[in-house]
Regions:
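Beta-rich carbohydrate-recognition and catalytic domains
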Residues: 1-91, 100-159, 170-213
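Conserved interaction-surface patches within small, structured recognition/assembly domains
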Residues: 166-168
Length: 213
């Protein structure tokens, strides 16, 4: 289980282990601060663990991927999903739910932030990674797929739609996304996984260039 802990230098990603969700063993920090919005992939790649996380480096808040043979020594750090100047996710991005394995690739659900004169707006976007080489981004949504509705504009932090976890029911094909509303409530959004993947596959790959849509 990855989680955010705190230090004198800022938040950082830490790890705990469990076999039954009754007893937990704290392993401690995985990466140095400032870092958060992290998740391990549910399987290894060529013997290596893979971690998606969001460090803050010289003010930049991009999504990175890193690899480790033992959950202790991390390297091969790469920017996975950068912010996009002028877009809805231009100022900050971060992982939301855990990576979900699908026949088309790893489904990534992330939050993107645009700062405006009236405050920040947090919305939800999607990406698709290669199944065996998850550092390769196959598709990325042009537009956000979930944003604050009028009734979600009020709370401790207005204008926030923050994805935190997801469940995919293979039998029904239903994807349930749980998300924070204005840092005050928890909501759930339901979609058909086939429709989600069909939309993503209609988006251009980053290598093909991106437009504002």
């Amino acid at each position: 289980i990855t989680y955010v802990s705190f230090s004198g230098s800022g938040p950082l990603v830490s790890l705990m282990l469990t076999e039954d969700f009754k007893e937990f063993t704290r392993i401690g920090p995985l990466v140095p601060p400032e870092d958060k919005d992290a998740s391990l992939f549910p399987r290894r790649f060529k013997g290596r663990y893979a971690l998606i996380h969001r460090p803050i480096i010289r003010g930049a808040a991009d999504i990175w991927i890193s690899f480790s043979p033992d959950l202790t020594h991390w390297g091969d750090h790469q920017v996975l999903l950068p912010t996009r100047p002028g877009w809805w996710d231009c100022h900050r991005v971060g992982l939301g739910a855990q990576p979900i394995e699908t026949p088309e690739g790893w489904l990534i659900i992330y939050h993107g932030v645009r700062m405006t004169a009236s405050g920040s707006i947090y919305r939800v976007g999607l990406a698709l990674l290669d199944l065996e080489e998850p550092w390769r981004v196959q598709r990325r949504s042009d537009e956000w797929v979930l944003g604050p509705k009028p009734y979600e504009q009020f709370g401790d932090v207005p204008g926030v739609t923050f994805p935190t976890g997801a469940i995919f029911e293979e039998e029904t094909g239903e994807l349930r996304l749980y998300y924070g509303i204005a840092d005050t409530m928890v909501g759930v959004a339901i979609a058909d996984m086939d429709e989600v993947l069909s939309y993503l596959l209609s988006c251009p790959s980053p290598a093909e260039g991106e437009s504002h849509g």
